[in-house]
C-alpha cells in the first residue's frame, strides 16, 4: 500500500465526516465555484519531500474549490487532476498530526493554491491561510465568531452552519 493510501485510511471519523459534508454542502451553494471532495491532485511537478511529505505524486484535500464550469462528468474518468484548485480544505481527524497538514499547506502554496483552510472539528474552529503559513486568520465558535471569512476568494460562511445541527 502506498503512503497516501495508508494516510487516507487513518482519517475517517464521525466529526471529520460531519464537518466535511456540511462544508461541502455550504460551498456547493456558491454559484461561483465547483466543490469537489477527496479529489486526487497530480503534483509530480514538485518534489514533495522538500516539505517533509512521504507522498510522491499526489495529494488529496478533503475538499477543494474550482471556478464554476471547470469540470463536468466525463465518459472516461480522470484519476488525478493536474490543475490546482483555488482552495484546499483539510479537516484534522484524531489520528492526524497538525504538522503533517501544515506541510501539505506548504506544498499547496508552492503549487499556487490561493488559500487553505484548516478545520478542527473538536475545537469548532477554522484557520484560513492565505499564500503562506504565517498569513492566517482564525475563526472559532468559542470566541463567538459568527462567520468564516476568506478574503482572497470572497467567501463568507456561517460557523454555526458548519459545526452545529440547525433547523432551517
List where the protein language model places each region.
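Gly/Pro/Ser/Thr-rich low-complexity, intrinsically disordered segments predominantly at protein N-termini
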Residues: 1-168
Amino acid at each position: 500500500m502506498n503512503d497516501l493510501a495508508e494516510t487516507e485510511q487513518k482519517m475517517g471519523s464521525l466529526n471529520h465526516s460531519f464537518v466535511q459534508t456540511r462544508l461541502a454542502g455550504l460551498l456547493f451553494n456558491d454559484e461561483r465555484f465547483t466543490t469537489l471532495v477527496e479529489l486526487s491532485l497530480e503534483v509530480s511537478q514538485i518534489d514533495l519531500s522538500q516539505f517533509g511529505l512521504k507522498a510522491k505524486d499526489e495529494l488529496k484535500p478533503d475538499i477543494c474549490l474550482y471556478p464554476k464550469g471547470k469540470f463536468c462528468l466525463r465518459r472516461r474518468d480522470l484519476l488525478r487532476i493536474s490543475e490546482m484548485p483555488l482552495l484546499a480544505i483539510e479537516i484534522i481527524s484524531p489520528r492526524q498530526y497538525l504538522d503533517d497538514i501544515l506541510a501539505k499547506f506548504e506544498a499547496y502554496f508552492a503549487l499556487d493554491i490561493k488559500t487553505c483552510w484548516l478545520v478542527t472539528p473538536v475545537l469548532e474552529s477554522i484557520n484560513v491561510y492565505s499564500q503562506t503559513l504565517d498569513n492566517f486568520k482564525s475563526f472559532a465558535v468559542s470566541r463567538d465568531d459568527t462567520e468564516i471569512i476568506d478574503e482572497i476568494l470572497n467567501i463568507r460562511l456561517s460557523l454555526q452552519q458548519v459545526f452545529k445541527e440547525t433547523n432551517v
